[in-house]
Amino acid sequence: MLDPKVKKAIDFAYQRILKFHKLQKVKDINYVDKLKNKIQYKNIVIDSVGLYVPANLPSTALMVGVPAKIAGVKKIVLANPRHNGKLNPAVMYVAKKLGIKNILSIGGAQAIASMAYIYKTSKIF
């Protein structure tokens, strides 16, 4: 069960992080010079990322998950080890808020290896 005060704090932090990182989003550039040369700068989104969230740190999930969501990453895998046999409700709330469907309840090298070799994520944070 998630304490309503914690939920409110997460919602507040989420909005602030979202606003800041939206400002960082790079735009594609299309340019035609006077000689009719077309120059293009195109951003290509990473197709999948793995987020390693150690222990009870929903802030880590926010700080790495929100930018991935803004960038348009299609598949996000979150690894968060159980603490005293339980999933952290605050981290799970962040995962739900970000629409993360792939959640691993493991930690350490096993989590990193699973995200790299089983889920085949392109980048791990």
Question: Where is each model-derived feature located?
Answer:
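A glycine-rich, acidic short-motif signal
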Residues: 92, 97-100
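N-terminal Rossmann-like NAD(P)+-binding subdomain of aldehyde/semialdehyde dehydrogenases
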Residues: 1-47
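Charged, amphipathic alpha-helical interaction segments
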Residues: 18, 22, 69-73, 100
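Generic marker of "main functional regions" within proteins
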Residues: 20, 27-31, 59, 72, ...
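Conserved small-residue-rich beta-alpha loop and adjacent elements
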Residues: 31-93
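A broadly conserved amphipathic alpha-helix scaffold signal in soluble, globular proteins
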Residues: 15-18, 65-66, 96, 113-117
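Generic structural signal for well-ordered, non-membrane alpha-helical segments
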Residues: 2-17, 42, 61, 84, ...
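Conserved NAD(P)+-binding/catalytic subdomain of aldehyde/semialdehyde dehydrogenases
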Residues: 99-125
